[in-house]
């Protein structure tokens, strides 16, 4: 995990509430947030125990998350590193952002993978945005 003071500052400057929605447990989340210098940025956390250990991408988990934090579908965005976890949020009307490790590498690795990624992005229709640089993506949002 790469810490980023810049990303922490950008997240702090974003309007609206920010929540963590994870298949990990809360203890892991706390350790990661501490390492990233982001302990006081988020308004809440929904970890795997909150869903009785049912992970994303099950629809019921997103419904529970939405209900816990009383989210308005029209003003909710989901940032996720696994694109499959964006399908249900998209159906719910959320903006979806697929955060990849290295988009250029993923798109150019080989023909089959490039076609698969393009199919996911273009044909599946559940990804609103794709980025491999979260800091710059968020800078352009604010």
Where are these regions (language model features)?
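Asp-based, Mg2+/Mn2+-dependent phosphohydrolase catalytic module
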Residues: 26, 30-142
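Short, acidic loop-to-helix structural element flanking the phosphoryl-transfer center
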Residues: 1-20, 26-30, 59
């Amino acid at each position: 995990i790469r810490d980023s003071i810049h990303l922490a500052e950008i997240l702090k400057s974003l309007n609206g509430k920010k929540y963590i929605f994870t298949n990990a447990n809360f203890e892991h989340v706390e350790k990661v947030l501490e390492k990233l210098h982001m302990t006081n940025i988020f308004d809440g956390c929904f970890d795997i125990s909150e869903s009785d250990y049912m992970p994303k991408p099950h629809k019921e988990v997103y419904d529970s998350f939405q209900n816990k934090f009383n989210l308005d579908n029209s003003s909710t965005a989901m940032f996720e590193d696994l694109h499959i976890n964006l399908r249900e949020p998209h159906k719910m009307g959320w903006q979806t952002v697929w955060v990849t490790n290295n988009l250029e590498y993923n798109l150019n690795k080989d023909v089959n993978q490039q076609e698969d990624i393009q199919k996911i992005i273009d044909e599946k229709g559940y990804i609103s945005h794709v980025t491999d640089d979260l800091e710059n993506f968020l800078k352009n949002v604010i």
